């Protein structure tokens, strides 16, 4: 410790040490005004422990030599202290600053990676443990639920078996055999009854015992002791419910409902019976249309018009058919129709050939003759005035076609006077003429022609319409003209009427003395005039060179348009 003491003394006291002692440790360099102080640290004074670095700063172990120079010659700015140079041992152990930073960085990165890996592993292990616990919890809950469901199912099955046993036992006991056995046991063997009941009970609950004796069922029941088995109380309510349930016949199949389409159709026909009538009535109309289209091959336009207006033609036919049973009420229309049909028969010989082989309508034609004669006797006294007017008007229209207008007017006045004086004689004469001159063969031909022409359609219907219009305009007295002489009876008097017309041409201008003889022949001559005026001879004499078919069409068209009879020429 001598050297440091001396150094301290020299520093504190300012004394100069000797050269011998400080030559080794000190070096002074003085260059004019510059002073350089170099201090060396002895190797013995180097502290190896890093923890004593702080204490070494207070208690310096090195030797620092300072030389006080003259304050005048040296300033503070000129003093330079050299850096402390490390010893040789320090030079060997020292490392550059750049290399230390890179290594530290590498070490830090390695340490960070290890820390992160450890932390991530910890988190992964923690998550795995959590998931493992969750899976175990789920399995536990699911197992508990499954066992609970199995126990409930087992209890339900046991209850069903018990219910079936009770139902079967009750059914057996209430059956005829069971009642008889109970009665016999109750009367004769009382202890046997108790024994039988015990046997029945053991048999009824045998299935339950087998079911509960199963190992799996026992495990389920043991694992869930809180589950209570199903218990049935044998009360009155349960017995009533069992009876109702048995009475419902649940074992029978449910009846299938009928199809809704059949019900709807039945309701429709029940609510609307008119639909059924309409469906049955439609084919009848088609049947009526078929023969009407095949009658006249020459009149194509007329058949087309009939098809366009079927309702009108049907109404006309129905009215004509409805009039026939009552000839005394609507005789004028029927008479005119029959007259025109007879004329058409005479004019068309082809139609006669087609009508003659038909024998079926003849029977139907003969029937109205008796009814006509009977109706004449009933209505003669009531409608004499109407008969007189119609007898006057019928020959008037037919005579206009062949005679001038002046002669017609004079004839009207004479005929009216004659008929007013002797009406009863005229009716008697007509009845006698009808009975004498009746020829059934010709009547059948004419009536068959009338039937055929009635089906033909428009010609007969148009003629009837025009003639009815003419008689309605002339008066209401035309309804019962000569009720005892129908038109198909008058058409047979053509030969006799010709002779009467030839003989009655001159006596028209005679006095009243000859009126009585003419009066008796008026109805026959008038009725015959209808036919003879349109006979083939008169048609030939009065023809103007036109064909018969064209004249018929012109006659029909003129009567339909004007409603009055016009002079028409007939030709064969």
From Swiss-Prot:
Keywords: Calmodulin-binding, Cytoplasm, Cytoskeleton, Nucleus, Repeat. The keyword Repeat applies. It comes from the Eukaryota. One of its GO terms (cellular component) is plant-type vacuole. Residues 108-136, 137-154 form the IQ domain. Belongs to the IQD family. This is Protein IQ-DOMAIN 30. It comes from Arabidopsis thaliana. The gene is IQD30.
């Amino acid at each position: 410790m001598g050297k440091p003491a001396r150094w301290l003394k020299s520093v504190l006291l300012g004394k100069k040490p000797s050269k011998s002692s400080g030559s080794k440790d000190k070096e002074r360099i003085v260059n004019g005004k510059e002073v350089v102080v170099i201090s060396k640290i002895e190797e013995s004074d180097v502290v190896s422990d890093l923890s004593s670095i702080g204490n070494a700063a207070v208690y310096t172990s090195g030797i620092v030599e300072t030389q006080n120079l003259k304050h005048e010659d040296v300033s503070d700015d000129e003093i330079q202290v050299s850096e402390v140079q490390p010893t040789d041992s320090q030079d060997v152990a020292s490392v550059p600053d750049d290399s230390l930073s890179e290594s530290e960085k590498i070490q830090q990165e390695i340490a960070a990676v290890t820390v992160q890996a450890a932390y991530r592993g910890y988190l992964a292990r923690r998550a795995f443990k959590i998931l493992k616990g969750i899976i175990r919890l789920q399995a536990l809950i699911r197992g508990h639920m499954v066992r609970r469901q199995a126990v409930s199912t087992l209890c339900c099955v046991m209850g069903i078996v018990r219910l079936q046993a009770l139902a079967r036992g009750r059914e057996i006991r209430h059956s005829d055999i069971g009642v008889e056995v109970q009665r016999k046991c109750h009367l004769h063997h009382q202890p046997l009854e108790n024994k039988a009941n015990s046997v029945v009970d053991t048999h009824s609950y045998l299935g339950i015992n087998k079911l509960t004796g199963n190992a799996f069922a026992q495990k389920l029941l043991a694992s869930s002791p809180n589950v209570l088995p199903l218990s049935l109380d044998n009360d009155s309510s349960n017995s009533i419910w069992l009876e109702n349930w048995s009475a419902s016949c649940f074992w029978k199949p449910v009846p299938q409902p009928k199809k809704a389409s059949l019900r709807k159709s039945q309701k429709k026909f029940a609510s609307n019976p008119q639909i059924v009538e309409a469906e049955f009535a439609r084919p009848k109309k088609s049947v009526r249309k078929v023969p009407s289209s095949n009658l006249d091959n020459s009149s194509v336009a007329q058949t087309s018009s009939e098809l366009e207006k079927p309702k009108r033609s049907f109404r006309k036919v129905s009215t004509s058919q409805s009039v026939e049973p009552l000839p005394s009420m609507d005789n004028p229309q029927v008479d005119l129709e029959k007259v025109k049909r007879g004329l058409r028969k005479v004019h068309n010989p082809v139609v006669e050939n087609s009508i003659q082989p038909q024998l079926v309508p003849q029977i139907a034609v003969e029937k109205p003759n008796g009814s006509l004669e009977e109706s004449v006797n009933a209505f003669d006294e009531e409608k004499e005035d109407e008969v007189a007017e119609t007898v006057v008007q019928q020959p008037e229209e037919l005579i206009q076609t062949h005679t001038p207008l002046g002669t017609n007017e004079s004839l009207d006045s004479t005929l009216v006077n004659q008929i007013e004086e002797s009406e009863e004689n005229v009716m008697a004469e007509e009845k006698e003429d009808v009975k004498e001159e009746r020829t059934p063969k010709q009547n059948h031909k004419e009536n068959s022609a009338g039937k055929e022409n009635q089906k033909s359609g428009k010609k007969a219907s148009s003629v009837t319409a025009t003639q009815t219009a003419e008689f309605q305009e002339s008066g209401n007295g035309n309804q019962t003209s000569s009720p005892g002489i129908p038109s198909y009876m008058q058409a047979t008097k053509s030969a006799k009427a010709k002779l009467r017309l030839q003989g009655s041409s001159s006596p028209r201008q005679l006095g009243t003395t000859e009126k009585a003889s003419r009066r008796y022949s008026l109805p026959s001559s008038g009725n015959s005039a209808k036919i003879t005026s349109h006979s083939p001879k008169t048609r030939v004499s009065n023809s103007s060179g036109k064909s018969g078919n064209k004249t018929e069409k012109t006659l029909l068209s003129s009567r339909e348009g004007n409603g009055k009879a016009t002079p028409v020429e007939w030709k064969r």
